[in-house]
UniProtKB/Swiss-Prot annotation:
Domain of life: Bacteria
GO molecular function, one term: structural constituent of ribosome
This protein's name: Large ribosomal subunit protein bL28
Originating species: Gluconobacter oxydans (strain 621H) (Gluconobacter suboxydans)
NCBIfam families: L28 (TIGR00009)
GO BP term, example: translation
Keywords: Ribonucleoprotein, Ribosomal protein
Signal peptide extent: none
HAMAP family in the cross-refs: Ribosomal_bL28 (MF_00373)
């Protein structure tokens, strides 16, 4: 499992620890990833995702998983999020076909 947010795409960065004597040693800056369960109203199911705290805030700010994914262009979404978006669109099309 990669250390990458499935919504924002944030990943590991590298840099230096710098001591008081200005000695530098390499280090990694890890994203604050949380295993979260988001509920999709359209799918009628919960979706487990590994998101950064910034990604969780972004989804909540946009009104939930469904509205965030449907309102975001595919070029801005990582592949994992695009897969969930396609599932949501398929279910929406089926529901629209049943009502028509």
């Amino acid at each position: 499992m990669s250390r990458r947010c499935q919504i924002t795409g944030k990943g590991v960065l590298t840099g230096n620890n710098v001591s008081h004597a200005n000695n530098k040693s390499r280090r990694r800056f890890l994203p604050n990833l949380q295993e979260t369960t988001l509920i999709s109203d359209i799918l009628g199911a919960s979706v487990r995702m590994r998101l950064s705290t910034d990604g969780i805030r972004t989804v909540e700010h946009n009104g939930g998983l469904d509205s965030f994914l449907l309102g975001t262009p595919n070029r801005k979404l990582p592949t994992e999020a695009q897969v969930i978006k396609r599932r949501i669109l398929r279910v929406q099309e089926r529901k629209a076909a049943q009502t028509a």
